[in-house]
Amino acid sequence: MSQTFGNSSKYLFTSESVTEGHPDKICDQISDAVLDAIIAKDPNAHVACETAVTNGLVVVMGEITTSCYVEIPELVRGVIKDIGYTKPEYGFDDRTCGVLTSINRQSPDIALGVNKSQEAKSGQVDELDLTGAGDQGMMFGYACTETPEYMPLPISLAHRLSKRLSEVRKNGTLAYLRPDGKSQVTVEYHNGEAKRISSVVIGAQHDPDVTTEKIQADIIREVIKPIIPTNLLDENTEYYVNATGRFVVGGPVSDTGFTGRKILVDTYGGFARHGGGAFSGKDPTKVDRSACYMARYIAKNLVAAGLADRLEIQVAYVIGVAHPLSVSIETFNTARMSHEDILSIIQKHFDLRPEAIIRNLGLRRPIYRQTAAYGHLGRPELDLPWERLDKVDAIKATMESLSVSK
């Protein structure tokens, strides 16, 4: 029999996260800051904002159709300052970096399908049919019972480590740290249950006059130990802190960053499948973003209601059509009812048309920049609409009625 996550006596899984100062994450935050600024003034704007950052230069580009005006260079510098790139010795800072913009309007060919869906063109009058999907593609959502936030443990811990790394920099606990950084966690599973942490990896950018030994001791004490549960650590857990021995040059000085380069960091750390579309800089008519959020919302509520311990949902769309082409689920042999019944519950309680998703989750609001670092999903410290468990009671009631009818 093949060895799988659920039946293997020893199964290692690794996920990574990055800090807000990572070059790719700088770009995600800038793109979402532009989106938030526009959607706050014009909720129906169409935004596809991409950012590139390199040594001394930020380029913001994309397709934006809106009735409002925002000062993009000012937004860019504000994000860079908030992240912590404020010192010239970093080689990149908010005051001296160049900012270039190249913005066009959304293609009229795309607007034909988004502004008026195929269903609306055929004469149907349901207002939720009016908005077509902004592109073709497939989107995935996932939830599991490993953590209180229904996320896989490896990515949950990796995000918390990266966030802690930024916290100890900003609050002065480890004032020698610089904004760039990464984390990686390997969890050892036994028959589908997390048993121990096999290894923890931290990359922390730092000032040049700090010894490797001090950094390693400080990071283990101030970052790793406060985050990783002690019952998952043992004498064989391996710690790697700045494994090359030095991480002074970082951020856009050492690596060019782009929006959308950290799609697994943004989602489930590789634990679930991914359709390939990025989130940041996209308004909610782009199903790459809104349908992934909705799929997470569905999966989380279904798992919280007890339908399965692990559940992945796939939704697929075609550009200009409101209704999804397909909806499918995978429960990894943990379901407590048939897949047919689960799909009927999804159909009963969740409307997957883009306009319905936007309205039900309240997505035409400036809520996106806060998601652009440390994950779009899970995030118990944020009140994200796709993380709410407000469908659990209704799902349980339907489960009971289905059981009675059989």
Swiss-Prot record:
Which PROSITE patterns would you find in this protein's record? ADOMET_SYNTHASE_1 (PS00376), ADOMET_SYNTHASE_2 (PS00377)
One Gene Ontology term, aspect cellular component: cytoplasm
Q: Where does Mg(2+) bind?
A: 24
Q: Which residues form a coiled coil?
A: none
Q: Does the keyword Magnesium apply?
A: yes
The record's subcellular location field reads: Cytoplasm
Residues that, per the record, bind L-methionine: 63, 106, 255, 286
What does the annotation say about its assembly with partners? Answer: Homotetramer; dimer of dimers.
Family affiliation:
Belongs to the AdoMet synthase family.
- The name under which this protein is listed is S-adenosylmethionine synthase
Q: Which gene encodes it?
A: metK
